[in-house]
Amino acid sequence: MSTLICSFDGLHDNRVLRYYADFEAHILHMDTQTEAGEKVSVHFTGLLAHWFENVVQDNILFGMDEISVDAFFEQYKDLLGGAISYGFPACCSIEELRDRMDREHIRVDSSLGLCGFVLAQEVELQCP
């Protein structure tokens, strides 16, 4: 079974201009710019959690992929094992988190370059 569900090719090598999370509205918004100077926005809704590392000015996205729930738990098992008892990414056990992700169809998207993940129900790319 493939762990890759979908690749978002329109983000390859885009520079991250800004991102913000609104926890009350359950959204995460990221503005990026292509090498040609075109703006591409990524809008996540139904936000459960996000985790990014190596965040610096002028991060470049290698890409963004939606991966299976099983692949997510395999890729981030060490992070989850150490953080779940502190309420991240959700105040529940790993088994309850997996059930919730299956039940709510939470999408799993990971970006490379700016490494990490976003757990959200929907994602939309907006190109002006």
What are the residue ranges of the model-derived segments?
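Surface-exposed, interaction-prone regions used to assemble/regulate multi-protein complexes
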Residues: M1-P128
